[in-house]
């Protein structure tokens, strides 16, 4: 059952420990645009990402190693729906002032479910069904739902194709956080000066482009698992031979968004039609960092997710 290097023989694994996997995946999106007046574009779109994964593993009884005579089945079902609605209006004034105004809303709904079961001590290769084992492990069954909502708007302005200003604001909400902290506001602003188009640089033939840029903004991070903010209980436990439930995770009513503030100042240029140079300075500060925080073992828990620090 081993080759000369001490590894499992692939033929042995295929014949005596077969593992069958199958996945059905769906990705798709639809959208609808209308232009009721000149410069106004209204768009609605829907997207779906879904899959159904199944795995069947068997270790036939005639295998030479401990753990033979085992069958396991598992599946995972996941889907995520994204709904986006935007309205964008572009217009100009006096031929030099150009505006783009956008307002939008987005919702993302995600659901996931996992299930697995294992049956042991099977004695007949012809009866490798889950009900044929003399012993079975406690099945694993998990599921979660999460929802993300956002309202956002942007304004872009340019004058004479040389001065540019961008403003953006958004309000994001996530079901992952505590009830009173699910919503947070974020914003950004930026400006760019195309100096090459100024009159005092028109006669500099070797200078192809020269741009000065500055931006400042905030963003949020909600990268935690579902229900980290809630105090949960678990079942399937025995105490003095009797089934019961017990606390499984520590809740945190103060859990909120991690936020990042970023300042960026840069200059870019191109000379002699071949050499490009770009210099940037940035400063980034992260507040309310989401991390696992160790707890005293006297609490009965190892850690909890908290907003622990700034960096």
Question: Which ranges hold each PLM region?
Answer:
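Extracellular/periplasmic, surface-exposed regions of secreted and cell-surface proteins
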Residues: 2-59, 68-311
